């Protein structure tokens, strides 16, 4: 399965769980301490990153989704750093600040790419009033399409059963990254994402794929779960659902450098994809591709839609094919930053013919990258009348994406692509026919941004309408 990126800008996700601050100290080591047989690190720089549930929220935001987060913190400097960092990424924070507790902080000392020691500053949050989290959840639920419960067994999800019940009552799916050997508190969840070690800690040693599926189905029935996604390290991941065939996904990791936060990435991409309208199996394929990227990075890491697109389609930009608007905007910025000239055109392209192919080839020669914006079915119907389009949007886009001249294909639902063009801002806007440049939709915006508008001629004797008429007349 090669999934298509959704528009994560349509995804609202609420994250509730154990938030923490990950701190890194970096420096070289050249000697052993005279005080004890340990290396001496000369600290030269440092870094601070949101971790735990906060890393999940960062992942949602980096994809372009709308993340809201609820968690427990202290009233201290790490809490301030967490909030400011997340707010800068447009994550809406609604933390419960408890002065008697420290904000969970993990300090890692790094040298030559290796972690020498980790120091944890934390106390488990216990006996907190469940209403502190539940009321914050109630405020957020009307604004989201998915809920993630990120459990690191630090106390934020002490009342997880009530959180699941409240989300399900609102018909919002609940995705949980579980912790520990007891899955009873997660009863009724939409999906759990245990790794293999966590899964085997609950069900015992797994001897084969069939054994994994059988044991997963047992857990699903016992705890009334919607599904289980077991992440299996070098063996990829397996999605198990009742009354459906298991869905096995091989790993896409090329090099494993650091698995820190990989589980956060899996559940965030999974939930965001479902929130954006993807079916569960396709959302899992996207999450699997994302995991293959982040394990090649150091520490708790996020990924962009560009990195996710490259993981799915390969590193060559020309393989992007069909792409969501938000991902396209990022792709165009990346291409322009490399000095590439981006050309854009648009049309219905209902029945692709030689005239279309010739036109697109000529457009592609004017730059380094070619975008084709395609009218959706409803847009075509408004423009062309009943009976059109002959081919639905997904098929028209798939055919265009298969042309060597075309780099990206993106749909638009309006009568004209003016809004889309004003967001993308290509270097050159091209239109076929006898238009005047100033009359082309989006042309003014492109020119105002320093771009160009150009009109190309269509090949004579090629017309979609004529082809349709010929078929109807039995002459084709």
Swiss-Prot record:
Pathway, per record: Nucleotide-sugar biosynthesis; ADP-L-glycero-beta-D-manno-heptose biosynthesis; ADP-L-glycero-beta-D-manno-heptose from D-glycero-beta-D-manno-heptose 7-phosphate: step 1/4; Nucleotide-sugar biosynthesis; ADP-L-glycero-beta-D-manno-heptose biosynthesis; ADP-L-glycero-beta-D-manno-heptose from D-glycero-beta-D-manno-heptose 7-phosphate: step 3/4; Bacterial outer membrane biogenesis; LPS core biosynthesis
Region of interest (Cytidylyltransferase), residue spans: 344-476
EC numbers: 2.7.1.167, 2.7.7.70
GO cellular component: cytosol
UniProt-listed InterPro entries: Bifunc_HldE, Carboh/pur_kinase_PfkB_CS, Cyt_trans-like, PfkB_dom, RfaE_dom_I, RfaE_dom_II, Ribokinase-like, Rossmann-like_a/b/a_fold
Reactions that this protein is recorded to catalyse: D-glycero-beta-D-manno-heptose 7-phosphate + ATP = D-glycero-beta-D-manno-heptose 1,7-bisphosphate + ADP + H(+); D-glycero-beta-D-manno-heptose 1-phosphate + ATP + H(+) = ADP-D-glycero-beta-D-manno-heptose + diphosphate
Keyword set includes ATP-binding: yes
GO-annotated molecular function: ATP binding; heptose 7-phosphate kinase activity; heptose-1-phosphate adenylyltransferase activity; phosphotransferase activity, alcohol group as acceptor
Residues engaged in binding ATP: 195-198
SUPFAM superfamilies to which the protein is assigned, alphabetical: Nucleotidylyl transferase, Ribokinase-like
Catalytic site: 264
Keyword presence, tRNA processing: no
Keywords, alphabetical: ATP-binding, Carbohydrate metabolism, Kinase, Lipopolysaccharide biosynthesis, Multifunctional enzyme, Nucleotide-binding, Nucleotidyltransferase, Transferase
GO biological process per UniProt: ADP-L-glycero-beta-D-manno-heptose biosynthetic process; lipopolysaccharide core region biosynthetic process
Chain residue ranges for the region called Ribokinase: 1-318
Pfam families, A to Z: CTP_transf_like (PF01467), PfkB (PF00294)
Sequence similarity: In the N-terminal section; belongs to the carbohydrate kinase PfkB family.
Entry function: Catalyzes the ADP transfer from ATP to D-glycero-beta-D-manno-heptose 1-phosphate, yielding ADP-D-glycero-beta-D-manno-heptose.
Self-association state and partner proteins as the record states: Homodimer.
Name used for this protein in its record: Bifunctional protein HldE
Protein's organism: Vibrio vulnificus (strain YJ016)
Gene: hldE
């Amino acid at each position: 399965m090669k999934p298509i990126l959704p528009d994560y800008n349509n995804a609202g996700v609420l994250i509730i769980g154990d938030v923490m601050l990950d701190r890194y100290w970096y420096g070289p080591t050249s000697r052993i301490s005279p005080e004890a047989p340990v290396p001496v690190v000369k600290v030269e720089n440092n870094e601070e990153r949101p971790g735990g549930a906060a890393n999940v929220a960062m992942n949602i935001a980096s994809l372009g989704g709308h993340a809201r987060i609820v968690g427990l913190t202290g009233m201290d400097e790490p809490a301030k750093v967490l909030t400011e960092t997340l707010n800068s990424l447009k994550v809406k924070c609604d933390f419960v600040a408890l002065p008697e507790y420290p904000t969970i902080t993990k300090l890692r000392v790094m040298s030559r790419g290796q972690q020498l020691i980790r120091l944890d500053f934390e106390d488990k949050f216990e006996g907190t009033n469940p209403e502190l989290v539940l009321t914050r959840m109630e405020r957020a639920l009307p604004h989201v399409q998915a809920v993630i419960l990120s459990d690191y067994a630090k106390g934020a999800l002490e009342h997880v059963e009530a959180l699941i019940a409240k989300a399900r009552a609102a018909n919002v799916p609940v995705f949980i990254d579980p912790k520990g050997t007891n899955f009873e508190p997660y009863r009724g969840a939409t999906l759990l994402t245990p790794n293999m070690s966590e899964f085997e800690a609950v069900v015992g040693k797994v001897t084969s794929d069939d054994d994994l599926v059988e044991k997963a189905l047992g857990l699903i029935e016992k705890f009334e779960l919607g599904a289980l996604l077991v992440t299996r390290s070098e063996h990829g991941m397996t999605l198990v659902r009742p009354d459906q065939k298991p869905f096995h996904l091989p790993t896409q990791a090329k090099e494993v450098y650091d698995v820190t936060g990989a589980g956060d990435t899996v559940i965030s991409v999974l939930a965001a994809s479902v929130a954006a309208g993807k079916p569960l199996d396709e959302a899992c394929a996207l999450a699997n591709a994302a995991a293959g990227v982040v394990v090649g990075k150091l520490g708790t890491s996020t990924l962009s839609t560009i990195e996710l697109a490259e993981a799915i389609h390969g590193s060559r930009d020309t393989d992007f094919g069909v792409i969501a608007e938000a991902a396209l905007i990022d792709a165009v910025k990346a291409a322009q930053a490399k000095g590439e000239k981006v050309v854009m055109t648009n049309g219905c392209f209902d029945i692709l013919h030689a005239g279309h192919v010739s036109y697109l080839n000529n457009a592609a020669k004017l730059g380094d990258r070619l975008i084709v914006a395609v009218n959706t079915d409803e847009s075509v119907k408004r423009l062309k009348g009943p009976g059109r389009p002959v081919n639905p949007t997904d098929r028209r886009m798939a055919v265009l994406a298969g042309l060597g001249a075309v780099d990206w294909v993106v749909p638009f639902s309006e009568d004209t692509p003016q809004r889309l063009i004003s967001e993308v801002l290509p270097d050159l806007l091209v239109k076929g026919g006898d238009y005047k440049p100033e009359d082309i939709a989006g042309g003014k915006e492109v020119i105002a941004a320093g771009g160009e508008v150009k009109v190309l001629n269509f090949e004579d004797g090629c017309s979609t309408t004529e082809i349709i008429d010929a078929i109807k007349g039995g002459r084709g």
